[in-house]
Design a protein with these regions (language model features):
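Extracytoplasmic low-complexity segments
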Residues: 61-68, 85, 211-219, 224-226, ...
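Extracellular glycan-recognition modules
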Residues: 252-255, 305-362, 395, 448-454, ...
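Flexible glycan-contacting loops in extracellular carbohydrate-active proteins
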Residues: 357-361, 408-438, 641-672
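Short, aromatic/His-centered strand-loop micro-motif at the edge of beta-sheets
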Residues: 362-384, 589-617, 662
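Localized edge beta-strand/strand-to-loop motifs within extracellular or lumenal beta-rich domains
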Residues: 381-395, 614-628
C-alpha cells in the first residue's frame, strides 16, 4: 500500500518537469520597425519628420512554451537617445502595455526632443519573465530620425511661354505647351505640390534636394489661368502657397488651310493660310459638301495618277507638335488611300487616310514607323479625320468624327521637309495610295488641337426639319410651326385645348375644369383604338444622323399591351418605333434586323419607368458619325446601342401607332405634344431643350 502511494506521488511530481521552460521573446527585426509611416532608417540617412514621431514595432513571443489556452502576450520597451548641444547623451524610454504577439506596439516620442538633431532608437520585447535582445544587437541596427520644425520658404514661379499679365497680358494659347519652373530657396526641398484650375493637385519631384522642378501644362481652354504651388521638404512640411497668374488666348489658326471650295474648273486650290495647292487633271472642283458643316463645296479625286493636289512645299515641321485634318468621303474602301501627307525621303513623313487590314478597312494616321487605326470607313459616307502628333509626349492620336479611335502610339517622326500632298502619299518610287472620292476643308495646325476643338471641327449642326406644336387642327390636319407639311389626324385623334382662363373654377362653381395642355395651349389626344397622326412621308432619313423628340402622357389606367408613340416604316416593316411596354415597365426603342416581312423585332434600348399619368419627354438620337442610336427619357436618362448602319425608311412618320401584320396596331392611349425632328444628331447637352415649347436652335 505504501509502495503504491510512492509511485503515484512520483508520477504526479514528474508532470510539471516535462513542461518547457519559458522562452524569451524574439529579437525585433529591423524590417518590422517604422518611424511614422517610414521604414526604419539605418546608417547615415535618417528619416526626417515634421513632428515628434510615433515609433512602431511588431513584436513576437515564441508559442512553443505556451500552456493550453494560454494567451501569448508581449510588451515593448522603447529607448531613444541623442547628444545635446553640450555634448551630453540624452535618453528617453517608454514601456508599452501588453498585447498579443505579432501585433505592433507604439510610442510617440516626447516633445522635448531637439530639432535638427539625429535621434536614434531601438526596441526590445518583454513577456514579463524575460526580454529579447535589443533590435540593434547582433545583425540588427538602430533606427534614426531628425525632427525638422521649420517649413520651407515659398517657391518662385516662372514660365518663358506664359509670362505674367504685367509682362504680356494675353499669351498664345490653347494647344500650346507651357513650361513652369518652381524654385524655393530652402535647401531641403524634395518636391513641389502644384495645381492648375480644373485639375487635381499633383507632385513634381526635384532632381536633387533644394533644386528646382519644371512641369509642362497644356491649356485646353482660353481665359485667365493660375498655378498654385507649395514647396515640400524632406520632413513633409509644406511652404506657404505661391500663386502665378497668366492669361491664355484662344488657339491660333491653322498654319495652312485649303477650304477646297474653289469654283468648278479651277486648276489650283486657294490657301486661306499657307501656300496654294496646284491640282492634277484628275481633280474636279465644285463637288458636294457635307451637310451642317458650313462648307459649300469640296473636290473630287478620281484615284488616278492625276488625282492630287500639292503645294510643292512643306506645310509644317512635323518634328514638332502638329495636327492635320479634313473631311473625306471615299468612293471605295477596298484599297489603301491617302487623304493628306507630307513628303520625306522614300516615303511620307506622315499619312492620314484609309488602310485595309485583316479585319477590313479602317481610318489611319501614320507617322514615322508608328500607325494608329480605328473607325469604319463606308463608301459614300462623309467622315471628319484628324491626326495629331504631340511632340511633348511623343504620342500620335487619331480622331474620327470628333471621337478618338484606336489606341494612341509612341511615334518618332522623321524629317519631312518635302511637299504637302492631298490625295496621295510618297512611295519609294513616285506616289502611291491615291484617293478616290471627295475631300474638303483640309487644315494643318502647328500645335496640339485639343479635344473640344476636335469636336467642333467635326461637328455637323443639326437642321430643324419640323416642329408640330399640336395646338390646333383644321380640317383634320395640325400645322407645322414654320409652314411645312402638316400632320393628318386619324379618326380617334383630337386636339385638346387647355383652359382659356375666361373663368376660374376655384372661384366660379359654374366654371368647368379643363385640364391643362401638356405643353403650351393644346395637345394631341389619342383614344388607343384608332387614333393617330401621320406625316405625308418620311420625316427623317434613317440612314443618316437624325433626332426626334416628343412629349407624351399615358392615360390608360390598365396598361395591358405595348403602345407605340413614334414609328417610321421601311418597305416591309417599321425601321424604328418608340413604345411603352407595360410587361417590362419600360420605354423601348425597337428596330428590326432586316427590312423584311416578318423580320423579328429587337429592343435595342430601353429605360425602366413606372408610368402613372406623368408627363414624359422622349427623344431618339441617331449619330451616324459614331454608329450609335440613343433613347433619352426626360432629357437626362439614356440608353445607347451600337448601330453600324441604319435601314432606309420610306414610310411616313406615325404618331401613336405602329405597323402590324400588314396593318396597324399598338395604338397609343394618351396625350402627345411637341413633335420635333432634326436632320443631324443633337448633342447630349441639347436634348433637354426638346419639348419645352420653343423653337430651339442647336447652334
Amino acid at each position: 500500500m505504501v509502495a503504491g502511494c510512492v509511485v503515484a506521488l512520483l508520477a504526479t511530481a514528474a508532470g510539471p518537469a516535462q513542461a518547457l521552460d519559458n522562452l524569451p521573446p524574439k529579437q525585433p527585426l529591423v524590417q518590422d520597425l517604422r518611424t511614422e509611416n517610414s521604414p526604419c532608417a539605418t546608417g547615415d540617412d535618417p528619416t526626417y519628420v515634421s513632428q515628434p514621431p510615433r515609433l512602431s514595432a511588431v513584436l513576437y513571443d515564441p508559442e512553443e512554451d505556451n500552456q493550453p489556452v494560454e494567451a501569448n502576450l508581449v510588451k515593448g520597451e522603447f529607448e531613444a537617445w541623442w547628444t545635446d548641444g553640450a555634448g551630453v547623451e540624452q535618453r528617453r524610454t517608454h514601456t508599452t502595455l501588453v498585447s498579443l504577439s505579432g501585433t505592433p506596439r507604439y510610442w510617440t516620442v516626447p516633445d522635448d526632443i531637439p530639432a535638427n538633431t539625429v535621434v536614434s532608437w531601438h526596441v526590445r520585447a518583454d513577456d514579463d519573465e524575460a526580454t529579447s535582445s535589443w533590435s540593434d544587437e547582433g545583425d540588427g541596427s538602430a533606427c534614426s530620425f531628425v525632427y525638422d520644425d521649420v517649413s520651407p520658404e515659398k517657391p518662385t514661379i516662372s514660365s518663358p511661354e506664359y509670362p505674367e499679365p504685367e509682362d504680356v497680358f494675353w499669351v498664345d494659347g490653347v494647344g500650346v505647351y507651357g513650361h513652369f519652373t518652381m524654385d524655393s530657396p530652402s535647401e531641403d526641398v524634395v518636391s513641389y505640390r502644384y495645381e492648375f484650375p480644373g485639375s487635381p493637385p499633383r507632385t513634381a519631384p526635384v532632381e536633387q534636394p533644394g533644386g528646382p522642378a519644371t512641369i509642362s501644362y497644356l491649356p485646353l481652354t482660353s481665359g485667365p489661368k493660375w498655378l498654385r504651388v507649395r514647396a515640400v521638404d524632406r520632413s513633409g512640411r509644406w511652404s506657404a502657397e505661391s500663386e502665378y497668374e497668366f492669361n491664355v488666348q484662344s488657339g491660333r489658326a491653322p498654319v495652312a488651310r485649303w477650304r477646297l471650295d474653289d469654283p468648278a474648273g479651277s486648276r489650283s486650290a486657294t490657301a486661306e493660310t499657307g501656300t496654294a495647292a496646284r491640282a492634277g487633271t484628275g481633280v474636279t472642283f465644285g463637288g458636294p459638301a457635307p451637310s451642317g458643316t458650313g462648307a459649300t463645296a469640296t473636290v473630287g479625286l478620281d484615284g488616278s495618277g492625276h488625282g492630287f493636289l500639292t503645294t510643292d512645299a512643306p506645310a509644317t515641321d512635323i518634328r514638332k507638335s502638329f495636327a492635320v485634318s479634313g473631311w473625306a468621303r471615299p468612293a471605295e474602301t477596298g484599297r489603301n488611300m491617302t487623304v493628306a501627307s507630307q513628303d520625306a525621303d522614300g516615303g511620307p513623313g506622315f499619312a492620314l487616310g484609309l488602310r485595309n487590314g485583316e479585319t477590313g478597312p479602317a481610318w489611319s494616321f501614320a507617322i514615322g514607323d508608328a500607325t494608329v487605326s480605328g473607325g469604319a470607313p463606308e463608301t459614300g459616307e462623309w467622315a471628319h479625320l484628324l491626326g495629331l502628333y504631340d511632340a511633348e509626349t511623343g504620342r500620335a492620336r487619331l480622331y474620327v468624327n470628333g471621337h478618338e479611335v484606336g489606341t494612341e502610339v509612341a511615334a518618332t517622326p522623321a524629317e519631312a521637309a518635302g511637299a504637302f500632298q492631298i490625295g496621295r502619299a510618297r512611295g519609294a518610287v513616285g506616289y502611291r495610295d491615291r484617293w478616290h472620292g471627295d475631300i474638303g476643308d483640309v487644315r494643318v495646325h502647328d500645335r496640339v488641337v485639343v479635344p473640344d476643338e476636335v469636336t467642333e471641327l467635326a461637328r455637323r449642326k443639326p437642321k430643324l426639319l419640323g416642329r408640330w406644336a399640336l395646338e390646333n387642327a383644321t380640317d383634320g390636319t395640325s400645322p407645322e410651326q414654320s409652314g411645312g407639311a402638316p400632320l393628318r389626324l386619324g379618326a380617334g385623334a383630337s386636339i385638346h385645348r387647355g383652359s382659356d382662363d375666361s373663368c376660374i373654377p376655384e372661384l366660379d362653381p359654374d366654371c368647368p375644369y379643363v385640364p391643362p395642355a401638356l405643353v403650351g395651349n393644346g395637345h394631341l389626344a389619342l383614344d388607343g383604338e384608332t387614333g393617330y397622326a401621320a406625316a405625308d412621308g418620311p420625316v427623317v432619313d434613317t440612314t443618316e444622323s437624325f433626332t426626334l423628340g416628343v412629349v407624351v402622357r399615358l392615360t390608360d389606367s390598365a396598361l395591358d399591351r405595348p403602345m407605340t408613340v413614334l414609328s417610321q416604316a421601311g418597305e416591309h416593316t417599321d425601321v424604328f418605333k418608340v413604345r411603352y411596354d407595360p410587361s417590362t415597365h419600360s420605354w423601348q426603342l425597337v428596330m428590326p434586323e432586316k427590312d423584311e416581312a416578318g423580320a423579328p423585332e429587337k429592343v435595342v434600348a430601353q429605360i425602366k419607368s413606372a408610368e402613372g399619368g406623368q408627363k414624359r419627354r422622349l427623344a431618339v438620337v441617331q449619330d451616324d458619325g459614331t454608329d450609335t442610336i440613343t433613347l433619352f427619357l426626360d432629357g437626362s436618362v439614356k440608353a445607347t446601342a451600337s448601330l453600324p448602319r441604319g435601314l432606309r425608311s420610306t414610310g411616313a412618320l406615325q404618331i401613336g401607332r405602329a405597323g402590324a401584320g400588314g396593318g396597324w396596331g399598338e395604338y397609343f392611349h394618351g396625350d402627345v405634344d411637341e413633335v420635333q425632328a432634326y436632320s443631324g444628331a443633337l448633342r447630349e447637352r441639347d436634348v433637354p431643350f426638346l419639348g419645352t415649347g420653343v423653337d430651339y436652335c442647336p447652334c
